[in-house]
Amino acid sequence: YDGVSISDMRASLIMSARTKVELEPNYSYVTARILLDELRSEALSFLGVAEQSTQQEMFDYYPKALQAFIEKGIELEMLNPELKTFDLNKLGKAINPDNDFKFTYLGLQTLYDRYFIHSNDIRYELPQIFFMRVAMGLAIEEEDRENRAIEFYNLLSSFDYMSSTPTLFNSGTMRPQLSSCYLTTIPDDLDGIFSAMKDNALLSK
């Protein structure tokens, strides 16, 4: 219809393409590419880098977006200010935009819905910046932290290794809680054992 936005067109394409995944699994990658275009437009425009981008342009835009993301995240009090002391030029050059194409639709949609940092419902964290932010948080106390961050990034972005959910959520942020487990003490009697089971169930809830 007249006046339809590009964002609404992408939403319609995503709804249409994802219904075909059961018929042809490769549609999962097609749908992920459409969602990726929407995310790039959303994040890059919010960060003031660009309104739209081609894949080739992302090799120039990703380093710029990393710098802008760190600055904006610190400004919004979402990211650890220590991240700004990294050599962001070196880290930006290590980002591989082609790794964005490794995502299936479900994987990218899950990150979009739950993991990417956002402000007022605008996602301004791109997939490779997400992995680099996690890597920077993990390497923040290392001696050679830029190279360690790049090593962590390469493992994460290639899907050779994936951190647990608390690490993905919190690494590099103002809430650097990276553990996904808790230690509890249990009294050595029947009442204590079953009380601990109840406490753990409530904690999981």
Q: Across the structure, where does each feature detected by a protein language model lie?
A:
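Extended catalytic cores of very large enzyme megasubunits
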Residues: 1-205
